Design a protein with these regions (language model features):
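Flexible coil/turn and secondary-structure edge motifs
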Residues: 1-308
């Protein structure tokens, strides 16, 4: 076992601990107070602007879970642009940060954040600093959500069950990649065109398998979340993971819609609506933006870990 430790600030530490401790490769977690100006603060002190951050001490097996991947899991649980606020919690103690004790971690942290930030187009508000001090929080805070199953949590704990689609495993499409697309695939993904309804064979494709971005190969959707919407386009209730899709306001054609684009390729995919089955969403996706890989063809590929 290759034990390593990192400290994370991501809003209320109850929810962050409940989420991170479920990730494969995490050995142990502890909540506490970090990088403040005074020694041994109490929860009351921290809640009254002591300057400490509510932090999660994460000990993990680096042979199972890389620091890069751990940070990617962390990013999906926070708002990286928010300053001193996560969810409904406001205060300096709720600032986001990554605090290291091994200087070799700093370039890994910075590289991971820079890569993720490049997909967003604006800077993150996440501080990256050496750990200057850390004090374990009171016992009643440790594993709080285990002791209080209905307790407050600003993080959907189910996020830990979503597969991690490594943002370093796929590349933005080159000119040659784009030239390999059909004219319709190019128009849809690069110029936000729309397939004619019922025109693409993937609309009626319901075999088990994986749907990836046709420009990059990044996994986007799985067949388990696909449904017959009778709208004329492939429809899904959700993406394979929260972080593979980007959302943009779209007021074109006199309509008020939410456009969805792929994370790595920035491909136009379609739109998302609130009329999915049983109160879920409907991701209405152009078949020309997708490549379907049947389940029996995933074995032996880089997608094998996504086989349910």
């Amino acid at each position: 076992m290759n034990e390593h430790t990192i400290y994370l600030g991501g809003g209320c530490f109850w929810g962050l601990q409940g989420y991170i401790r479920k990730i494969s490769g995490v050995i142990s977690t502890e909540v506490g107070y970090a990088n403040g100006p005074t020694e041994n603060p109490s929860y009351e002190d921290v809640c009254h602007d002591s300057g400490h951050v509510e932090a999660l001490k994460v000990t993990y097996d680096a042979d199972v879970l890389s620091l890069d991947h751990l940070i990617q899991y962390f990013l999906r649980a926070i708002d990286p642009f928010s300053v001193n606020k996560q969810g409904g919690d406001v205060g300096i103690q709720y600032r986001t940060g990554i605090y290291y004790t091994d200087t070799a971690d700093k370039p890994i942290i910075e590289s991971t954040l820079a890569r993720a930030q490049s997909f967003e187009g604006k800077p993150f508000a996440i501080e990256v600093l050496p750990l200057s001090n850390y004090y374990a929080a009171e016992e009643y805070h440790q594993n709080y959500l285990d002791k209080n199953p209905n307790g407050y949590c600003h993080i959907p704990l189910g996020l830990s069950n979503e597969p991690l689609v490594d943002d370093n495993a796929y590349n933005k499409p080159s000119e040659e990649d784009l030239k390999a697309l059909s004219p319709q695939e190019f128009e849809v993904t690069q110029n936000s065109a729309t397939d004619a309804p019922f025109s693409h064979n993937l609309t009626d494709e319901f075999k088990p398998g994986l749907y990836v971005d046709i420009t990059t190969g990044e996994p986007l959707f799985v067949s388990a979340h696909k449904f017959e919407s009778h709208c004329g386009w492939p429809s899904f209730t959700k993406p394979i993971a929260k972080d593979v899709i980007k959302y943009y306001q779209d007021d074109s054609h006199g309509m008020n819609r939410i456009e969805v684009r792929s994370r790595i390729g920035n491909s136009h995919l379609g739109h998302v609506f609130e009329d999915g089955p049983n109160g879920s969403l409907r991701y209405c996706i152009n078949g020309s933006a997708l490549r379907f890989i049947p389940k029996d063809e995933l074995k032996g590929t880089k997608y094998e870990y996504l086989i349910p």
